[in-house]
Structures are given as C-alpha cells and as structure tokens.
Amino acid sequence: MVSNLLKVVLAIETSCDETAVAVVRSDKQVLSHKVLSQKEHVVYGGVVPEIASRAHINYLYDLTSQSIEESGCDLADIDAIAVTSGPGLIGGLIIGVMMAKAISSVTNKPIIEVNHLEAHTLLIRMFHDIDFPFLVLIISGGHCQFLIVHDVGCYQRLGSSLDDSLGEVFDKVARMLNLGYPGGPIIEKKSIMGDSKSFFLPRALINRFGCDFSFSGIKTAVRNIVVNQKYIDNDFICNISASFQDCIGDILVNRITNAIHMSQAINCKINKLVVTGGVAANHLLRNRISICVKDNNFEVLYPPTELCTDNGIMVGWAGIENLSKGYVSNLDFVPKARWPLESIKRSS
C-alpha cells in the first residue's frame, strides 16, 4: 500500500478528440485542469482519427506545460503520472502514453496506465462518499454498458450494446438532420420544443430479459422517416428529436430496471447506480433515469455535468485510486484500442 500522505498526480487524456491534462491531489483538490476540445471535426460530423492524432501532437506539450505551471507545482512535486492507455483511438492513445512515459522516465516517478472507462466510473468517488460495490451505467460516444463495481480494478459486466453506442446514435441522428457535431446537446435542445408523440420509433429489446441494448433499429427508423419527409423544417426537426429522446428514455428505463434487479441478485448490498459518460450530461434523460431509479428504491448519482465528457480530472482521480491500492505500471505497457473494463489486471 502507498503512504496515506497527500499525493499529487499529473494526468493526461488523449483517447478521442479532447486533449486534456490535469493535476489532481488525493484530498480531492484539483490544482489545475486544461481541456481542449478539437473543433476540427465539426465539419465532418464526427471524429476523424488522423485529424485527432495530429491535433494531440500539436496541443499536448503546451497543454501539459500550462497545467503544471497553473497548479503551482513543478515536476519534483508530482508523485505519479496517470495516462489513459485505452480504450480509444490508437493514434491519440500512443501520443498521450509517449508523453507520460517521457515524463516518468525523466523524473523517475511512477506511471499508472488508466482504463478510460475506469476513469469515468471512479470519478463519482471524488464528489460523493460512495462505497463499493455499486452499479454503473456508462453511456458515451464509444460505449454503453452496465457493470458492477466491486472495487478498484474489479468489475463485472451485466450488459452492453449489441451494436451502436448511445452517443454514437445521437451523433448519427444529428447528422441525418444536418444539426452538427456533437449531436447530443443539439438534439436535447431541439427536443424540448417538439412533440414526443409525433413519430413512433422501435424500442429494441424492451421488456426482454437482461440489460443489453440495441440502437441500430432506431437509427434506421429515423433515417427512413427523414428520407420520406418532403419538408424538413424546424418543426419537423424538433418533433423527430423529441420522439427520438422519448424512445431512448423508454429503453433506458426498462434496461435500468432489469440491471438493478440483476445486480441485487448478485449482491443485495448494492443500492446505488452511477450514470456517467458524455450522454449522462443530457438533463432530459437524467430526469427519466432519476424517476426510474427512485421507483426501484435505488439512489442515482451523476458526475458534475461538465465532467461527463472526457477530461483529465477523471484520469487523475483514477490514478489516485489505483495509487492508493499500490497499483502502478511498468514502462513497457502499450496503449490498447480495445480494453474491456472487466479484463483489467492489476499488480502492485
């Protein structure tokens, strides 16, 4: 185990289209946080991996220097370096890992490879006193899954998407409607002004056993409606957005109810659901989820809205959680485009 003295961790996140660096302390203080969301992808309606990698190369060094300076620390004050090592876009991961390894080598400080999904999952413990075990729903641009969080580095998957992630479907629907990228916030805003009963969309897997998801049928149904619509005006966009959001809400309520029952059958002490990832910032979906969870005698917790999307703070906190367990990495680890959370293996 690592000493209980305050630890300072430098964190680097480059798994997708955010270049982020933070300096986080083990008493839950954020000493600095820099994040640059790459605007280059907007014109393409989604993330272009090569453009993302080049942007990380252009921004990461300066962002790291600025974050260290803003924290009031120098490299000698840093106790460890935490870096996202997967899952994600391999080009960006390589750049972040190379930077972290260089700093670790020069300073002789320990390095911690962080699973991106673990970072999203454990962030809640920075803001709430929540003990293990608990249930988590990760809903983001690349992932959609339920897991039981037994401890740091110990996860059990209950269900996941069989096709698209939820954030991916939001982006694709927004692209069909020429709304721009990222699609989630725009669709949420449009849906507020629409009629959720205007169009019927299929609720895949609803009322079936388990807590897997399938969103490809919804995407196809929206495309068919858009293709057959003669006039795509603002009223149409608001109504299809509202119908889409309502459909997603129904699916989440059904799948969450099943996941709660499944988790309690495994461990009756589980009574909290954490919802995290970029889509967890959607306030309309939060309202649906919160009602459902309360009806099932559970408590639901969300990270701060601004930290639902990728950021360095979550990587730094995951580093601190791992460091507290004595989990550090050798310099020979490699970034991984795929890294299921339940496959994590730790060594101290």
From Swiss-Prot:
Q: Where in the cell is it found?
A: Cytoplasm
Q: Where does Fe cation bind?
A: H116, H120, D310
A biological process term (GO) from this entry: tRNA threonylcarbamoyladenosine modification
* UniProt-recorded Gene Ontology molecular function terms: iron ion binding; N(6)-L-threonylcarbamoyladenine synthase activity
Q: What is its main location?
A: cytoplasm
Q: Which cofactor does it need?
A: Fe(2+)
* EC number(s) stated in the UniProt entry for this protein: 2.3.1.234
Q: Which gene encodes it?
A: tsaD
Residue ranges crossing the lipid bilayer per the database entry: none
Q: Which NCBIfam families match?
A: gcp_kae1 (TIGR00329), T6A_TsaD_YgjD (TIGR03723)
Protein name as it appears in the record = tRNA N6-adenosine threonylcarbamoyltransferase
Please give the catalytic activity noted in the UniProt record.
L-threonylcarbamoyladenylate + adenosine(37) in tRNA = N(6)-L-threonylcarbamoyladenosine(37) in tRNA + AMP + H(+)
What family classification does the UniProt entry report for this protein? Belongs to the KAE1 / TsaD family.
Which cellular component terms (GO) are annotated to the entry? cytoplasm
The UniProt record gives the binding positions of substrate as I138, I139, S140, G141, G142, D171, G184, N282
Query: Which CDD domains does this one have?
Result: ASKHA_NBD_TsaD_bac
Record key words, sorted: Acyltransferase, Cytoplasm, Iron, Metal-binding, Transferase, tRNA processing
Q: What does this protein do?
A: Required for the formation of a threonylcarbamoyl group on adenosine at position 37 (t(6)A37) in tRNAs that read codons beginning with adenine. Is involved in the transfer of the threonylcarbamoyl moiety of threonylcarbamoyl-AMP (TC-AMP) to the N6 group of A37, together with TsaE and TsaB. TsaD likely plays a direct catalytic role in this reaction.
The free-text cofactor remark is: Binds 1 Fe(2+) ion per subunit.
